From Swiss-Prot:
GO terms for molecular function: histone binding; histone H4 reader activity. GO terms for cellular component: nucleus. The gene is Brdt. Residues 445-463 have a biased composition (Basic residues). It comes from Mus musculus (Mouse). Residues 210-239, 391-420, 442-508, 607-747, 859-934 are annotated as: Disordered. Residues 496-578 form the NET domain. This is Bromodomain testis-specific protein. Residues 859-874, 915-934 have a biased composition (Basic and acidic residues).
C-alpha cells in the first residue's frame, strides 16, 4: 500500500455531540461559574490554542490517534455543551475537562511541548476550580416547573383564555425585573471606590425584597450572579392563583437563610487570601519535621490519652482549619488566627513544657506569627462603606418585605406599588452613593492639606522675591498637574480584576522581546519591576526580592502588559537622552578635529620622550647595601611588571638609544627619586622637586588629549589597583638580603607608579614610552643601550619645547603621593627577624651534624682496630679510651656551642631550641601567610580620593 493511499485512509470521526437529546440539562450556579470564569480563563491562556478545536488527525498525520483515544474532548465542545445546557451537574463538565487533559498525557510523551502546555492549563484549571461555590444550586428552576404546570392547566381547562392570561402575567412580570439591573447598577458605576463585597451584599438584599412576586419569571444575569435560589419543592408547585401573602410568608425564612449563605461565599477579603497563603505555607513540606503532629485531630484512643478531652475542651488542628477556610467559614483574619492560636494553646496546656511536641509547636507558631504580622490592614473607609451599605440595604429589604406582604392581590395595584417602591429605592441608593463619595474624598483632602502645608514655605519666599525668582512658577504648575494626575491613579487597584480579564495574552515573541528589554535596563530600574510583579502576583508577594525567580509563563497577562509599559517608558527616556546631547557636525569638521587631536598627542608624546631621555642619561646615584653572607635566589618579578617592561623595551629601543647619546648632567632620574622618597626625609624633599617636572607634563598631555573624564578616572583607578596588587608579590621578597630590603621594594613601586602614569597619558596615542633606567635595572638587570643617529636628528630640535613652558597644576601633592610607595615596614621587619631565626636554626643543625659525624668516625675506627682499643684499655695512662674520646668530642661541641651562644641574641639553650623549632617554624609560616593576605587586600583610599579630586578640578 503506497503512502498517499495511507494518508487518505485517515478519517476524522464526527465531533462529540453537544446537544443532549436523551434528557434536558439544567443550569446551576457551579455550571455558570465553569462557563463564565473557568472556561473563559482557560480560553484566554497562551497555551490553550492546541485544545480549542478537536484534534485533526488528517492534518497532523496522526493515523493512530483515534484508535488510542476513545473519547476525544476539546474546549470548543465543552463551551458548546455549556451554552446548550448539556450538563445536569457540574461534575460532568469537570469530568470532560479531566478527559481532555488525560487524552493529552496518554497519547504524547512526558517531555513534549504539548504536555507542558497541558500541565500549565491544568494548573490554572485547578486554581480557578478552587474558587467555585461549594453548594450546587439550580438557577431558574422554579420558572421551568411552573411553566409546565401552566401548560397542563391550559390543556385541561379553557384553551384560549388561560394561556393568554398567563402570557400577559409573564410578560408583565418580566418587565419589572428587567428594569432592576439598570436601576441598581447605574449608581454603582458612579462610585467605584466602594469595595465589591459591599456592592454584592447590597444587590442581594435589595433585589430579594423586590423580587417576591416575580419569582416565576426568568432572572437576569446580575440577579443570577448575586443570589442562587434553592431547588424547587412540591409545595411551590401549587396552582398559580395562590394568594400572594402566603407565598411571601413562606419565602421569608429560606430567603434570609440564602442571604447568609451567599454572604459567606462572596465575602473573601484580601486578608483572608493572605490567611489561606499562610495556611498553605504551614502545610508545606519544608515545615513537615515539626508540623506533622498538627495535621490531623488528636486520636486520643490510639495514643492512649484518656484524659485529653477533659483537659482540652475545644480541640483544633490544621486539617479542621483548612476545611473551614475551604468552606469560607471565617469572616475575617482574626477568626483564623484565633483558631490557629487555640491549636497551639491546647498543645501547651496538655503537654509539659520540656516535651518534644511543645518545642515543635513553638517553632511552627514562630512561622505563623512571622507571616501573620505581614498581612496588610484593611482600609478603614471601606469598612465604613460596608457598614453603611449593609445597614441601608437591610432597611430597604425590611421596607420592601413589609410593603410586599401588605400588597393587594390585584396586579394593577401591585404594579403601581412597585413603581413607587422602585423610585424610593433609587433615591435611597443615590443617598448611599453620595455618602460613599464623601467618605472616599476624605483621604484626598488630607493629602491636599499636607501638600498645602509643604508648599506654604516656598510661597512665602515667592511673595518676598517675586522679581528674583520668576522661574519657580512653571515648576509649581507642573507639580499641581502631577498631583491631579496622581489622584485618580488610586482608583486603579479596584479595577484589577477587569484589567486581568481584558488584558491581551502575550505570545512567545513578545515575551522574548520583553525579557531582552528588561536585560537592557539599568540596575536601579529592576527594583520597580520586582515591585510590579509582587504587587500583582499573590504567589510571589512574600518572596525575597533579592532572590526572586520569575517565570513569564506563570505570570498573568495583565502583569506582563504592565511590565511591558514600564520597560518601554524607561527605554524611551534612555533613547531621548543621547539624542539631545548629539550635535550635528559635518564629516569634514570631524576629520579635521581628529587630525588636530592626533597631532597634539604626537607632539606631547615626543616632548615627554625627549625630556625623559635627558633625565635617564644623568647618572643615578643609589647607595647599594653590602651583600649579606648566603643570599637565597630572589623570586621572579610579578607578571604585570615583567610584561610591561618587555613591552616598553621592545617598543622604544630607538628612543632609548637617542637618549643615551645626548646626555646631560645635573639631576637624578625620576625612578630613583621616587624610589628613595620614603627612606629618609632629606632625600624625599630633594626628590620631590625633581619628580615634579616629570609627572606634571604627563598630566598636561592627558588634558590636551581631551579624553572624557570617566575614561581618565577609570585609567587612574586601574593603575592604583595594579599598584596595590603588586604589593603582595613584592612583600614575598622577605628572604632577600638583609641590608636594605625596604629600598628595593620602594624602587620597584616607584618604577611601577611612573609606568602607570605613562599608561594613563598615552591611552589614545600611537607611541609608548620606555621605562626609566633604574626601573629596568631593578626588573630586568642592566639596560641595553642602542645608539642611532637618525633618532638624534629627529628628536633633538623638539627637546627644548617643554623646558621653556612654566606649567602650574592644582593638587601637586596628590601626584607626589603617587610616586611614594605604601609603607610596608612591619612586613619587612618581620621578614628580617624570620631570616635571622632561620639562620640560627641552620647553624645549630650544622653543629649537631658535625658532632654526630665525629662520633660515628671514632666508633668505626675502634671497630676496625680492636688491638689498639685493648691496649688503650690495659694502659690507661698511655692512650685514650672510648669514654675519654667521647668526652673530648662532647667538650669540643660544648665549647663551640658556648662560643656561638655568647652573643645576647643567641642566649637560649640548644635543647629548648630543638624542641620548639618545629612548632615555631609552623607558627611563623602561618603568621607570614596571614600578613601577606592582609597586605594583598589593602588599598590606599586617600591616594584614590586625591586622584579623583585632581581630575575633577582639572576638568572643571
Amino acid at each position: 500500500m503506497s503512502l498517499p493511499s495511507r494518508q487518505t485512509a485517515i478519517v476524522n470521526p464526527p465531533p462529540p455531540e453537544y446537544i443532549n437529546t436523551k434528557k434536558s440539562g439544567r443550569l446551576t450556579n457551579q455550571l455558570q461559574f465553569l462557563q463564565r470564569v473557568v472556561l473563559k480563563a482557560l480560553w484566554k491562556h497562551g497555551f490553550s490554542w492546541p485544545f480549542q478545536q478537536p484534534v485533526d488527525a488528517v492534518k497532523l498525520k496522526l493515523p493512530d490517534y483515534y484508535t488510542i483515544i476513545k473519547t476525544p474532548m476539546d474546549l470548543n465542545t465543552i463551551k458548546k455543551r455549556l451554552e446548550n445546557k448539556y450538563y445536569e451537574k457540574a461534575s460532568e463538565c469537570i469530568e470532560d475537562f479531566n478527559t481532555m487533559f488525560s487524552n493529552c498525557y496518554l497519547y504524547n510523551k512526558t517531555g513534549d511541548d504539548i504536555v507542558v502546555m497541558a500541565q500549565a492549563l491544568e494548573k490554572l484549571f485547578m486554581q480557578k476550580l478552587s474558587q467555585m461555590p461549594q453548594e450546587e444550586q439550580v438557577v431558574g428552576g422554579k420558572e421551568r416547573i411552573k411553566k409546565d404546570i401552566q401548560q397542563k392547566i391550559a390543556v385541561s381547562s379553557a384553551k384560549e383564555q388561560i394561556p393568554s392570561k398567563a402570557a400577559e402575567n409573564v410578560f408583565k412580570r418580566q418587565e419589572i425585573p428587567s428594569g432592576l439591573p439598570d436601576i441598581s447598577l447605574s449608581p454603582l458605576n458612579m462610585a467605584q471606590e466602594a469595595p465589591p463585597i459591599c456592592d454584592s451584599q447590597s444587590l442581594v438584599q435589595i433585589t430579594k425584597g423586590v423580587k417576591r412576586r416575580a419569582d416565576t419569571t426568568t432572572p437576569t444575569t446580575s440577579i443570577a450572579k448575586a443570589s442562587s435560589e434553592s431547588p424547587p419543592t412540591l409545595r411551590e408547585t401549587k396552582p398559580v392563583n395562590m394568594p400572594v401573602k402566603e407565598n411571601t410568608v413562606k419565602n421569608v425564612l429560606p430567603d434570609s437563610q440564602q442571604q447568609h449563605k451567599v454572604l459567606k461565599t462572596v465575602k473573601v477579603t484580601e486578608q483572608l487570601k493572605h490567611c489561606s497563603e499562610i495556611l498553605k505555607e504551614m502545610l508545606a513540606k519544608k515545615h513537615l519535621p515539626y508540623a506533622w503532629p498538627f495535621y490531623n485531630p488528636v486520636d486520643a484512643d490510639a495514643l492512649g490519652l484518656h484524659n485529653y478531652y477533659d483537659v482540652v475542651k475545644n480541640p483544633m488542628d490544621l486539617g479542621t482549619i483548612k476545611g473551614k477556610m475551604d468552606n469560607q467559614e471565617y469572616k475575617d483574619a482574626y477568626e483564623f488566627a484565633a483558631d490557629v492560636r487555640l491549636m497551639f494553646m491546647n498543645c501547651y496546656k496538655y503537654n509539659p513544657p520540656d516535651h518534644e511536641v511543645v518545642a515543635m509547636a513553638r517553632t511552627l507558631q514562630d512561622v505563623f506569627e512571622l507571616h501573620f504580622a505581614k498581612i496588610p490592614d484593611e482600609p478603614i473607609e471601606s469598612m465604613h462603606a460596608c457598614h453603611l451599605t449593609t445597614n441601608s440595604a437591610q432597611a430597604l429589604s425590611r421596607e420592601s418585605s413589609s410593603e410586599a406582604s401588605s400588597g393587594d392581590a390585584s396586579s394593577e395595584d401591585s404594579e403601581d406599588e412597585r413603581v413607587q417602591h422602585l423610585a424610593k429605592l433609587q433615591e435611597q441608593l443615590n443617598a448611599v452613593h453620595q455618602q460613599l463619595q464623601v467618605l472616599s474624598q476624605v483621604p484626598l483632602r488630607k493629602l491636599k492639606k499636607k501638600n498645602e502645608k509643604s508648599k506654604r514655605a516656598p510661597k512665602r519666599k515667592k511673595v518676598n522675591n517675586r522679581d528674583e525668582n520668576p522661574r519657580k512658577k512653571p515648576k509649581q504648575m507642573k507639580q499641581k498637574e502631577k498631583a491631579k494626575i496622581n489622584q485618580p491613579k488610586k482608583k486603579k487597584p479596584l479595577l484589577k480584576s477587569e484589567e486581568e480579564d481584558n488584558a491581551k495574552p502575550m505570545n512567545y515573541d513578545e515575551k522574548r522581546q520583553l525579557s531582552l528589554d528588561i536585560n537592557k535596563l539599568p540596575g536601579d530600574k529592576l527594583g520597580r519591576i520586582v515591585h510590579i510583579i509582587q504587587s500583582r502576583e499573590p504567589s510571589l508577594r512574600n518572596s525575597n526580592p533579592d532572590e526572586i525567580e520569575i517565570d513569564f509563563e506563570t505570570l498573568k497577562a495583565s502583569t506582563l502588559r504592565e511590565l511591558e509599559k514600564y520597560v518601554l517608558a524607561c527605554l524611551r527616556k534612555r533613547s531621548l537622552k543621547p539624542q539631545a546631547k548629539k550635535v550635528v557636525r559635518s564629516k569634514e569638521e570631524l576629520h579635521s578635529e581628529k587630525k588636530l587631536e592626533l597631532e597634539r598627542r604626537l607632539l606631547d608624546v615626543n616632548n615627554q620622550l625627549n625630556c625623559r631621555k635627558r633625565q635617564t642619561k644623568r647618572p643615578a646615584k643609589v647607595e647599594k647595601p653590602p651583600p649579606p653572607p648566603p643570599p637565597p635566589p630572589p623570586p621572579p618579578p610579578p607578571p604585570e611588571l615583567a610584561s610591561g617592561s618587555r613591552l616598553t623595551d621592545s617598543s622604544s629601543s630607538s628612543g632609548s638609544g637617542s637618549g643615551s647619546s645626548s646626555s646631560s648632567s645635573g639631576s637624578s632620574s625620576s625612578s630613583s627619586s621616587s624610589g628613595s622618597a620614603s627612606s629618609s626625609s632629606d632625600s624625599s624633599s630633594s626628590d620631590s622637586s625633581d619628580s615634579e617636572p616629570e609627572i606634571f607634563p604627563k598630566f598636561t598631555g592627558v588634558k590636551q588629549n581631551d579624553l572624557p573624564p570617566k575614561e581618565n578616572i577609570k585609567q587612574i583607578q586601574s593603575s592604583v589597583q595594579d599598584i596595590t596588587s603588586a604589593e603582595a608579590p613584592l612583600a614575598q621578597q622577605s628572604t632577600a638580603p638583609c641590608g636594605a630590603p625596604g629600598k628595593h621594594s620602594q624602587q620597584m613601586l616607584g618604577c611601577q607608579v611612573t609606568q602607570h602614569l605613562q599608561a594613563t597619558e598615552n591611552t589614545a596615542s600611537v607611541q609608548t614610552q620606555p621605562l626609566s633606567g633604574d626601573c629596568k635595572r631593578v626588573l630586568l638587570g642592566p639596560p641595553v643601550v642602542h645608539t642611532s643617529a637618525e633618532s638624534l636628528t629627529v628628536l633633538e630640535p623638539e627637546c627644548h619645547a617643554p623646558a621653556q613652558k612654566d606649567i602650574k597644576i592644582k593638587n601637586a601633592d596628590s601626584w607626589k603621593s603617587l610616586g611614594k610607595p605604601v609603607k610596608a615596614s612591619s612586613v619587612l621587619k618581620s621578614s628580617d627577624e624570620l631570616f635571622n631565626q632561620f639562620r640560627k636554626a641552620a647553624i645549630e643543625k650544622e653543629v649537631k651534624a658535625r658532632t654526630q659525624e665525629q662520633m660515628r668516625k671514632h666508633l668505626e675506627h675502634n671497630a676496625k682496630d680492636p688491638k689498639v682499643s685493648q691496649e688503650n684499655q690495659r694502659e690507661p695512662g698511655s692512650g685514650l679510651t672510648l669514654e675519654s674520646l667521647s668526652s673530648k668530642v662532647q667538650d669540643k661541641s660544648l665549647e663551640e656551642d658556648q662560643s656561638e651562644q655568647q652573643p645576647p641574641s643567641e642566649a637560649q639553650d640548644v635543647s629548648k631550641l630543638w624542641l620548639l623549632k618545629d612548632r615555631n617554624l609552623a607558627r611563623e609560616k602561618e603568621q607570614e601567610r596571614r600578613r601577606r593576605e592582609a597586605m594583598a587586600g589593602t588599598i590606599d583610599m586617600t591616594l584614590q580620593s586625591d586622584i579623583m579630586t585632581m581630575f575633577e578640578n582639572n576638568f572643571d
